[in-house]
Amino acid sequence: MDKLLDRFFNYVSFDTQAKANVKSVPSTQGQRKLAQALQQELLTLGFSHVTLSDHGCVMATLPANVSWPVPTIGFIAHLDTSPDFSGKNVNPQIVENYRGGDIALGIGDEVLSPVMFPVLHQLLGHTLITTDGKTLLGADDKAGIAEIITAMVRLKHRNVPHGDIRIAFTPDEEVGKGAQFFNVAEFDAQWAYTVDGGGIGELEFENFNAASVAIKIVGNNVHPGSAKGVMVNALSLATRYHQELPVDETPECTEGYDGFYHLQSIKGTVERAEMHYIVRDFNRDSFEARKKNMVDIAKRVGKGLHRDCYIEIVIDDSYYNMREQIIKHPHIIELAQQAMLDCDITPIMKPIRGGTDGAQLSFKGLPCPNIFTGGYNYHGKHEFITLEGMEKAVAVIMRISELTAKRAKES
């Protein structure tokens, strides 16, 4: 395994849970500690141009071992884990030769069940790495880090022909800031792949267009006994606002290429209320229409209010569908598809119902689709990964690197 599993277990021992709404990047010190550890590991392994930025981004180069010119490619994974669930004191469990049925997670009542997660039926005989039911696992995306480094080490030791390969490990992907301070010019690759996907074979170059929406509602509070014609209940206005949105266009009612409105939080009193939404859609025109709809609803619900009472809406775009950029470079996808086929893997092309660092990087001039890690059920206690999936990811990374050099020689 060339330390693949050892690396992974080492990386998940770092608590790198990201924090939302923090101005600094990285948002947590644990990410910086892992970045420093990776910097040292890469230096020890003999990588060149190993750097660690002020914002916790690690970069390094595996130098070419061929004499002909080869395009510089890159592989990228992220340091942080989801803010939605604890990543502290992760205690991975190894289940060898999975035979089906429920898997106990630690000593409590938590189980990983094929009833809830039918994908387990496809993984009989595999080696599973699970949580102990108290934390997430961190395969998203420390598996990606372990797979990239292991692939680079194997390329070097086995003398597989390859050009210059750049690797990078970024902070705060889970809170949408992973690419904010990524220096594309310094990375200096013609294209790259994030290793941040799910099950074996996943290859993704489409993601949501995404925006966050903050709504502030100011009402007027008086004694309810004498409130007629005077009270303006901010909570009632918030309720009216939400009810104007389509009930079947929410995350729990959508899949595939469907977009949605998602109310993430609501709080308030009669005097004042706040609502926070995210808006997602694959189609740019539909995305713009969703945002316009939210503004129009605010105008309708707020119409006729006393001038001291109002509804304020602020919309911030987060990222866009990288398909717009990737389709200009079809060879990047074709190369990954061929690499998977050469590794006896059927490529599974599917849209990302979320975002990756690659989405933002693609709009910064670094086309960057996403490939699988072998993991499942991210962001919670049921997260798990298969050792076979991890090995397959390593093989695909190596084959992409080899094919790039081979095609450059033939062209």
UniProtKB/Swiss-Prot annotation:
<dbReference type="GO" id="GO:0005829">
    <property type="term" value="C:cytosol"/>
</dbReference>
<feature type="binding site">
    <location>
        <position position="174"/>
    </location>
    <ligand>
        <name>Zn(2+) 2</name>
    </ligand>
</feature>
<protein>
    <recommendedName>
        <fullName>Peptidase T</fullName>
        <ecNumber>3.4.11.4</ecNumber>
    </recommendedName>
</protein>
<comment type="similarity">
    <text>Belongs to the peptidase M20B family.</text>
</comment>
<dbReference type="GO" id="GO:0006508">
    <property type="term" value="P:proteolysis"/>
</dbReference>
<dbReference type="GO" id="GO:0008237">
    <property type="term" value="F:metallopeptidase activity"/>
</dbReference>
<dbReference type="Pfam" id="PF01546">
    <property type="entry name" value="Peptidase_M20"/>
</dbReference>
<dbReference type="InterPro" id="IPR001261">
    <property type="entry name" value="ArgE/DapE_CS"/>
</dbReference>
<dbReference type="GO" id="GO:0008270">
    <property type="term" value="F:zinc ion binding"/>
</dbReference>
<keyword id="KW-0031">Aminopeptidase</keyword>
<feature type="binding site">
    <location>
        <position position="78"/>
    </location>
    <ligand>
        <name>Zn(2+) 1</name>
    </ligand>
</feature>
<keyword id="KW-0645">Protease</keyword>
<dbReference type="GO" id="GO:0045148">
    <property type="term" value="F:tripeptide aminopeptidase activity"/>
</dbReference>
<feature type="binding site">
    <location>
        <position position="140"/>
    </location>
    <ligand>
        <name>Zn(2+) 2</name>
    </ligand>
</feature>
<feature type="binding site">
    <location>
        <position position="196"/>
    </location>
    <ligand>
        <name>Zn(2+) 1</name>
    </ligand>
</feature>
<dbReference type="Pfam" id="PF07687">
    <property type="entry name" value="M20_dimer"/>
</dbReference>
<comment type="function">
    <text>Cleaves the N-terminal amino acid of tripeptides.</text>
</comment>
<dbReference type="InterPro" id="IPR011650">
    <property type="entry name" value="Peptidase_M20_dimer"/>
</dbReference>
<keyword id="KW-0479">Metal-binding</keyword>
<dbReference type="InterPro" id="IPR036264">
    <property type="entry name" value="Bact_exopeptidase_dim_dom"/>
</dbReference>
<feature type="binding site">
    <location>
        <position position="379"/>
    </location>
    <ligand>
        <name>Zn(2+) 2</name>
    </ligand>
</feature>
<keyword id="KW-0378">Hydrolase</keyword>
<feature type="binding site">
    <location>
        <position position="140"/>
    </location>
    <ligand>
        <name>Zn(2+) 1</name>
    </ligand>
</feature>
<keyword id="KW-0482">Metalloprotease</keyword>
<dbReference type="GO" id="GO:0043171">
    <property type="term" value="P:peptide catabolic process"/>
</dbReference>
<feature type="active site" description="Proton acceptor">
    <location>
        <position position="173"/>
    </location>
</feature>
<keyword id="KW-0963">Cytoplasm</keyword>
<dbReference type="InterPro" id="IPR010161">
    <property type="entry name" value="Peptidase_M20B"/>
</dbReference>
<keyword id="KW-0862">Zinc</keyword>
<dbReference type="InterPro" id="IPR002933">
    <property type="entry name" value="Peptidase_M20"/>
</dbReference>
<feature type="active site">
    <location>
        <position position="80"/>
    </location>
</feature>
